[in-house]
């Protein structure tokens, strides 16, 4: 029996290079994508993924020597309009929509329908609404074409972007980290839509750092590293170890490996009893032991972050008791908590954690600069050495300590923030979504740091929406639902820590009693 020939590629990018002043972002990268395929693109931050896609979208011009082919024909993409005419649409992490315009107006932007005399005619909003109604229905939208975009949720706005791509008859759809702002239910809906578009013959280039998404969606995965093409894996050949090794250029066996000794249940470090804020947290209790990594899981809105901020003292509590190292603890501010040895890494590093217009050195030292004061002046040399030591210890990729934090990748920003917290010598460290938006290499570094802290006797609480992460790093897992602790997995219970058990507790289909037996 003869095997059928594979379909002709819809997109071929051959030998694509891009040089910026003093930096070569891409070096002869090639990528082939077929119709009806979800082709994932992976690599660490700075690997060249975004640059390659910006060349495809017309935002950047490639260096001479490479070529782009669609349906086997070379084309020139010299700007976003040329990309759109070639059938390319890109949905970025930051959605490109006008919130004060309707859904129909956003879908038709740059292609407005007019009455009368060409471009001088008045915009025909009714015709635009009629023209995109069928696309919205086809994609399962539960809002109409005249809905104001600013009133929609992030997931619904993302659907508007997809509708715009479909309406322009895009054949190649690029999606850059599309699930970052979405809940698990919204993510499931997005995946359903992606499969629908794939079945209709679209070629989808999917960029993500999340392994579970890559496994679930991908037909093939291509990996970039340091601006160069490393290779492409078929779906059947995918494994976390192989992908990570391709991305970082070295073997990372046991990606989530617990490399610390079992904690001592008799060495209680933090005790929380019946803590509540009167709204999102409704009476939670937990224990954390020295050398333990405690995971907190739950759906978006379950109250995980609010619980962490209550313990830390960033929000007032209406009731409850907290004991730290055997002493009553009632921080009225984050400063008091830090001085007592309890620190919190926020889930929103850019708005609540980092000073983006300040240097790496300043960000690392800002929580402990009082130690360096001599006769009212800061010891800058001591602060500079502290920053250099932190950069080396956490493998922060930065040319020097005086570069602004805002110029760094997400993973390096996270490590700067983490290094600042570690300079306070904490006894308890609460990490809220510690690997959100960071690449695989940075994730492995953060997991290494968590293990080192646990080995040193620090109690670590990890809040994460990535279930493989929670399962991989935590000794025990508490699952929250609607502001309460719904159940405990692992530890002294008989309930194993599994994705199914976490989801069951988080959604209410499993009770605390059934989780423990």
UniProtKB/Swiss-Prot annotation:
What is the recorded membrane topology of this protein?
A: Peripheral membrane protein
Entry EC number(s): 7.5.2.7
The answer on whether this UniProt entry bears the keyword Glycosyltransferase reads no
Q: What does the record give as the reaction this protein catalyses?
A: D-ribose(out) + ATP + H2O = D-ribose(in) + ADP + phosphate + H(+)
- The enzyme class is translocase
One example GO MF annotation: ABC-type D-ribose transporter activity
User: What GO cellular component entries does it have?
Assistant: plasma membrane
Q: Where is the ABC transporter domain?
A: 11-251, 263-507
According to the lineage, what is the superkingdom?
A: Bacteria
Keywords for this protein: ATP-binding, Cell inner membrane, Cell membrane, Membrane, Nucleotide-binding, Repeat, Sugar transport, Translocase, Transport
Stored Gene3D superfamilies: P-loop containing nucleotide triphosphate hydrolases (3.40.50.300)
Which CDD domains has this protein been placed in? ABC_Carb_Monos_I, ABC_Carb_Monos_II
Matching SMART domains, A to Z? AAA
User: Which subcellular locations apply to this protein?
Assistant: Cell inner membrane
> Can you tell me which residues bind ATP?
43-50
One Pfam family from the record: ABC_tran
What is the role of the protein in this entry? Part of the ABC transporter complex RbsABC involved in ribose import. Responsible for energy coupling to the transport system.
Which family is this sequence assigned to?
A: Belongs to the ABC transporter superfamily. Ribose importer (TC 3.A.1.2.1) family.
Q: What quaternary structure, including any partners, is listed in this protein's UniProt entry?
A: The complex is composed of an ATP-binding protein (RbsA), two transmembrane proteins (RbsC) and a solute-binding protein (RbsB).
Q: What is this protein called?
A: Ribose import ATP-binding protein RbsA 2
Q: What is the lineage of its organism?
A: Bacteria, Pseudomonadati, Pseudomonadota, Betaproteobacteria, Burkholderiales
Q: Which gene encodes it?
A: rbsA2
């Amino acid at each position: 029996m003869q095997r059928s020939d594979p379909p002709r590629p819809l997109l071929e990018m051959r030998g694509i290079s891009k040089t910026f002043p003093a930096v070569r972002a891409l070096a002869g990268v090639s990528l082939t994508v077929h119709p009806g395929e979800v082709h994932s693109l992976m690599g660490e931050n700075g690997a060249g993924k975004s640059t390659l896609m910006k060349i495809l979208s017309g935002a950047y011009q490639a260096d001479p020597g490479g070529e782009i082919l669609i349906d086997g024909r070379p084309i020139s993409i010299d700007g976003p309009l040329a990309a759109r005419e070639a059938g390319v649409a890109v949905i970025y992490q930051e959605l490109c929509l006008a919130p004060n315009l309707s859904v129909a107006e956003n879908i038709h932007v740059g292609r407005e329908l007019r009455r009368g005399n060409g471009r001088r005619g008045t915009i025909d909003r009714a015709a635009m609404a009629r023209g995109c109604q069928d696309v919205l229905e086809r994609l399962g939208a539960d809002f109409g074409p005249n809905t104001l975009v600013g009133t929609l949720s992030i997931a619904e706005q993302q659907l508007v972007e997809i509708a715009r791509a479909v309406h322009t008859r895009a054949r190649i759809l690029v999606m850059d980290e599309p699930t970052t702002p979405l809940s698990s239910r919204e993510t499931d809906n997005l995946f359903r839509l992606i499969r629908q578009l794939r079945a209709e013959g679209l070629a989808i280039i999917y960029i993500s750092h999340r392994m579970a998404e890559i496994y679930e969606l991908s037909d093939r995965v291509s990996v970039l590293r340091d601006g160069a093409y490393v290779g492409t894996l078929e779906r059947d050949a995918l494994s976390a170890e192989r992908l990570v090794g391709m991305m970082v250029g070295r073997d990372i066996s046991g990606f989530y490996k617990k490399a610390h000794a079992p904690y001592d249940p008799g060495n209680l470090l933090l005790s929380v009893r019946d803590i509540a804020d009167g709204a999102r947290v409704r009476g939670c209790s937990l224990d954390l032991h020295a050398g333990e990594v405690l995971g907190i899981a739950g759906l978006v809105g379950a109250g995980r972050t609010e619980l962490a901020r209550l313990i830390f003292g960033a929000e007032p509590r209406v009731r409850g008791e907290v004991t730290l190292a055997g002493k009553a603890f009632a921080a009225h501010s984050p400063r008091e908590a830090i001085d007592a040895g309890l620190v919190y890494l926020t889930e929103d590093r850019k708005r609540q954690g980092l000073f983006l217009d300040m240097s790496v050195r300043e960000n690392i030292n800002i929580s402990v600069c009082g130690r360096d004061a001599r006769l009212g002046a800061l010891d800058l040399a001591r602060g500079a050495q502290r920053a250099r030591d932190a950069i080396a210890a956490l493998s922060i990729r930065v040319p020097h300590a005086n570069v602004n934090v805002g110029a760094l990748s997400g993973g390096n920003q996270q490590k700067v923030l983490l290094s600042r917290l570690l300079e306070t010598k904490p006894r308890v460290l609460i990490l809220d979504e510690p690997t959100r938006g960071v690449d695989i290499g940075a994730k492995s570094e953060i997991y290494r740091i968590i293990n080192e802290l646990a080995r040193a006797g620090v109690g670590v609480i990890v809040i994460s929406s990535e279930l493989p992460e929670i399962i991989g790093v935590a000794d025990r897992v508490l699952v929250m639902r609607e502001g309460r602790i719904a159940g405990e997995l692992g530890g002294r219970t008989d309930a194993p820590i599994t994705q199914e058990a976490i989801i069951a507790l988080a959604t209410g289909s499993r009770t605390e009693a059934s989780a423990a037996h």
